[in-house]
């Protein structure tokens, strides 16, 4: 099984540069605006799109992403509408990978088999489900693999050598290394330690390793890019969108322009870093 994720990372490896993986919340601040943001991300420099599935109890997310999820839910976003976003995006872009990220509850309520069928039909390439450990692979991971959808695992600084093989077992697409303990949007990690961790994980897998949590600026993204196959940025993009909304969460400025400006700057920085390192 070769997915768009596999193809994209193979292309980037051939180019000698890491991926910029961009996260935003589906339906934030509303469906129409969020879809415009999604469609604009690849042109701004995003290599992979993480599409957030809003959920009412997002335990791993910091205040910014929690607020984005709440705005989306208040605007009527559902899992079906998030899948619709993927399908609409695919009408214009058949190459940029889409990874849906969130929690298991909405998928369980939707129905696993129905969800995987609809996700595949909508052009979704991968899943990150933060509250499903490897011990529960039979719930979603293995059915996703059978449906041709990558299942991407999170590893953390506390994932020890005993735990790591279990985390990597049945993983596909890429490995998401959470560069610190805590919630999304926390402070940036020590880049030297990140490099050490990535090298350690690479001893156990051939999958690309992307690093996220705490990456907010182009400079931070560049620092992480020297150590990883990809850099994940989420909270900063969500904040850029939020900065264009009024106190009620409605659009007052231009969230699409704000998000794409940031992504363009991040992409320029990430791409330049690897090129400099290769010279």
UniProtKB/Swiss-Prot annotation:
Q: Kindly state the subunit structure of this protein.
A: Tetramer of two alpha and two beta chains.
GO-annotated cellular components: cytosol
Query: What InterPro entries does the annotation carry?
Result: Aldolase_TIM (IPR013785), RibuloseP-bd_barrel (IPR011060), Trp_synthase_alpha_AS (IPR018204), Trp_synthase_suA (IPR002028)
Give the encoding gene's name: trpA
UniProt keyword annotation of Secreted present: no
Reactions it catalyzes: (1S,2R)-1-C-(indol-3-yl)glycerol 3-phosphate + L-serine = D-glyceraldehyde 3-phosphate + L-tryptophan + H2O
This protein's UniProt keywords? Amino-acid biosynthesis, Aromatic amino acid biosynthesis, Lyase, Tryptophan biosynthesis
Q: What start and end residues bound the annotated signal peptide?
A: none
> What are the EC numbers?
4.2.1.20
Query: Is Lyase a UniProt keyword of this protein?
Result: yes
Q: In which pathway does it act?
A: Amino-acid biosynthesis; L-tryptophan biosynthesis; L-tryptophan from chorismate: step 5/5
Q: What does this protein do?
A: The alpha subunit is responsible for the aldol cleavage of indoleglycerol phosphate to indole and glyceraldehyde 3-phosphate.
A molecular function (GO) term? tryptophan synthase activity
Q: Catalytic residues?
A: 50, 61
Q: What is this protein called?
A: Tryptophan synthase alpha chain
Family, according to the entry, reads as follows: Belongs to the TrpA family.
């Amino acid at each position: 099984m070769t997915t768009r994720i596999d193809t994209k990372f193979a292309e980037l490896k051939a180019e000698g540069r890491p991926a910029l993986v961009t996260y935003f919340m589906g339906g934030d601040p509303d469906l129409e605006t969020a879809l415009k943001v999604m469609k604009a991300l690849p042109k701004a420099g995003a290599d992979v799109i993480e599409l957030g599935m809003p959920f009412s109890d997002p335990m791993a997310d910091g205040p910014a992403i929690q607020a984005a999820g709440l705005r989306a839910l208040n605007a009527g976003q559902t899992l079906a509408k998030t899948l619709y976003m993927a399908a609409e995006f695919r009408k214009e872009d058949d190459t940029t990978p889409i990874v849906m990220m969130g929690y298991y509850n909405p998928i369980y309520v939707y129905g696993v088999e129905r969800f995987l069928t609809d996700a595949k039909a909508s052009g979704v390439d991968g899943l990150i489900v933060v509250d499903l450990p490897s011990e529960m692979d039979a719930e979603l991971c293995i059915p996703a693999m059978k449906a041709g959808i990558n299942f991407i695992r999170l590893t953390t600084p506390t994932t020890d050598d005993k735990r790591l093989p279990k985390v990597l077992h049945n993983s596909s697409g890429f490995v998401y290394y959470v560069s610190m303990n805590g919630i999304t949007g926390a402070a940036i990690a020590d880049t030297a330690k990140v490099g050490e961790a990535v090298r350690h994980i690479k001893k156990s897998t051939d999958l690309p390793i992307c690093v996220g949590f705490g990456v907010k600026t182009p400079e931070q993204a560049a620092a992480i890019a020297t150590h990883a196959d990809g850099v994940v940025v989420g909270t900063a993009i969500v904040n850029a969108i939020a900065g264009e909304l009024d106190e009620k969460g409605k659009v007052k400025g231009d969230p699409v322009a704000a998000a794409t400006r940031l992504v363009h700057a991040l992409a320029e920085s990430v791409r330049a870093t690897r090129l400099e390192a290769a010279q």
